[in-house]
């Protein structure tokens, strides 16, 4: 499935999702919502207050975001999500990164998940 990236400038929300995929459960890691399908695969990530989390201008997220990557490691108790944004500024690629951790409160199976 094709991964789509949408940015809501007014609300400062970044949404990355697999087009046409259906979400069955959502994990809330503070300002990051991760959607999973019935098989436990990631089908979407919504990042609230994205410009603040990545310390970038909202305009950059709207016009200069060229790539998104997220890798999550899931254990019985914990989820660690490493997110990278790739921005193109003055013909130079800039990478902004954030690592978020939270409890595995919805009983996801252990392993690694990737989106982007």
Curated annotation (Swiss-Prot):
Stated name of the protein: Uncharacterized protein MJ0789
The highest taxon in the source lineage is: Archaea
């Amino acid at each position: 499935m094709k991964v789509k990236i949408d940015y809501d400038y007014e609300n400062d929300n970044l949404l990355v999702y697999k087009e046409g995929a259906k979400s069955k459960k959502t994990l809330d890691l503070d300002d990051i919502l991760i959607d999973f399908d019935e098989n436990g695969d990631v089908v979407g990530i919504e990042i609230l207050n994205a410009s603040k989390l990545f310390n970038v201008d909202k305009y950059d997220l709207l016009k200069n975001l060229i790539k998104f990557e997220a890798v999550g490691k899931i254990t019985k108790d914990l989820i660690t999500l490493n997110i990278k944004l790739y921005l193109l500024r003055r013909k130079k690629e800039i990478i902004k990164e954030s690592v978020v951790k939270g409890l595995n409160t919805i009983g996801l199976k252990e392993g690694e998940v990737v989106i982007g």
